C-alpha cells in the first residue's frame, strides 16, 4: 500500500511490464485502476539454457559471469522490437510518467532504460552509474534449485556495470553509435527522438 501511495504521489500514468505471463501470474502488479498497464513480455534469448545449467549445478561462477556478458550483448541486439514498442508507447497519450519493470529489474529493464537514457542525451558514464544502483536495490528471486552453486547464482543476479557495458559496446560495435542504432534498427525519427527528449528530460 505504501508503494501504491508513492506511485500516486509521483503521478504515474502507465506501467510497462516486460515479464511473461507466468512471471506476471506469480507476482501481479498492484496499481491504481486508473494507471494504464502495458504488457510486452519476453524472455532474453539464451536465458532458459543458462538457468537450466545453473540449476543442474554445471555452471561455475566464472562461466556464469562470461555467460551474462554474452547475454547482455544479445539482449541489446536481439530484442529491438520491444525497445521500439517502449519508445512509441511512451510517446502515446498518457504514456508517461511511467514505470518500466521486469522480474529482477536489472536485465530487461536495465538494457531498456539504458538505451532510452542514451537516446535522450544522458552521458554513458551516468547511465552506467544509474544501472549500478540496481545492484543494491535487488530483491531475492526464487528461481534456482537448492543445489545450484550460490556463487554462480550471485553472478547471474548481480548488476555488474560490465554487464551493461557489454550491451552498449555491442550496439556501438554493430551500429557505430546508439543514435544510429535507434534510427536504423528501431526506426525512430529525429522528430520522435526530440519528442522523447522533451518528455523525459527536465
Residue spans of the language-model regions?
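Cys-dependent protein tyrosine phosphatase-like superfamily
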Residues: 1-99, 111-202
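Ser/Thr-glycine-rich phosphate-binding loops at phosphate-binding pockets of nucleotides
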Residues: 104, 108-109
Amino acid at each position: 500500500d505504501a508503494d501504491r501511495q508513492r506511485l500516486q504521489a509521483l503521478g504515474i500514468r502507465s506501467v510497462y511490464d516486460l515479464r511473461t505471463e507466468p512471471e506476471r501470474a506469480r507476482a501481479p502488479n498492484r496499481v491504481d485502476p486508473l494507471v494504464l498497464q502495458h504488457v510486452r513480455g519476453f524472455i532474453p534469448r539464451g536465458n532458459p539454457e543458462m538457468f537450466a545449467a545453473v540449476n543442474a549445478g554445471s555452471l561455475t561462477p566464472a562461466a556464469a559471469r562470461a555467460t551474462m556478458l554474452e547475454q547482455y550483448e544479445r539482449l541489446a541486439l536481439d530484442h529491438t522490437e520491444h525497445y521500439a514498442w517502449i519508445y512509441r508507447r511512451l510517446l502515446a497519450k498518457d504514456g508517461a510518467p511511467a514505470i518500466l519493470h521486469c522480474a529482477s529489474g536489472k536485465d530487461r529493464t536495465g538494457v531498456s532504460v539504458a538505451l532510452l537514457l542514451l537516446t535522450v542525451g544522458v552521458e554513458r558514464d551516468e547511465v552506467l552509474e544509474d544501472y549500478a544502483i540496481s545492484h543494491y536495490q535487488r530483491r531475492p528471486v526464487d528461481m534456482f534449485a537448492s543445489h545450484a552453486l550460490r556463487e554462480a547464482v550471485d553472478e547471474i543476479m548481480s548488476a555488474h556495470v560490465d554487464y551493461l557495458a557489454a550491451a552498449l559496446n555491442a550496439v556501438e560495435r554493430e551500429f557505430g553509435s546508439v543514435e544510429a542504432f535507434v534510427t536504423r534498427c528501431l526506426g525512430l525519427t529525429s522528430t520522435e527522438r526530440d519528442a522523447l527528449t522533451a518528455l523525459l528530460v527536465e
